[in-house]
Amino acid sequence: MAKEYSRTQRVAQEMQKEIAIILQREIKDPRVGMATVSGVEVSRDLAYAKVFVTFLNDNTLEQVKTGVRALQDAAGFIHSLLGKAMRLRVVPELTFAYDNSLVEGMRMSNLVSQVVQNDRLRRSASPVDKTDREDKED
């Protein structure tokens, strides 16, 4: 029977916390900006880790690419600091990827809000009372 909460999940969760602290306190590169670690996926053998990040201030594709490139350039430095912070025999090799789920979630939320607003406007523009509906059904 498989464990409900595996070691890789625990390591990924701890890595997410530690990398977030490192990005906040140690990385001074202005290209990174306001980076947030949204998730970490660790391979089963703990050799590789994919770190998903979002950038709060950067909206353009070029800014995002620059930020991810800067993080990838700093991966060795982050790896060494992570090794000092965590008690692992082998610290996973880090790769950084942009997580667009926050942007997609905001886009979907805006679409839903637009539909609700359009529906309210349509209902207020053409009031139909109950007697009109009954006449149409007959």
Curated annotation (Swiss-Prot):
Predominant location category: cytoplasm
Family: Belongs to the RbfA family.
Record PROSITE patterns: RBFA
Keyword Cytoplasm included in the entry's annotation: yes
Subunit structure: Monomer. Binds 30S ribosomal subunits, but not 50S ribosomal subunits or 70S ribosomes.
Keywords per UniProt: Cytoplasm, Ribosome biogenesis
Name the record gives this protein: Ribosome-binding factor A
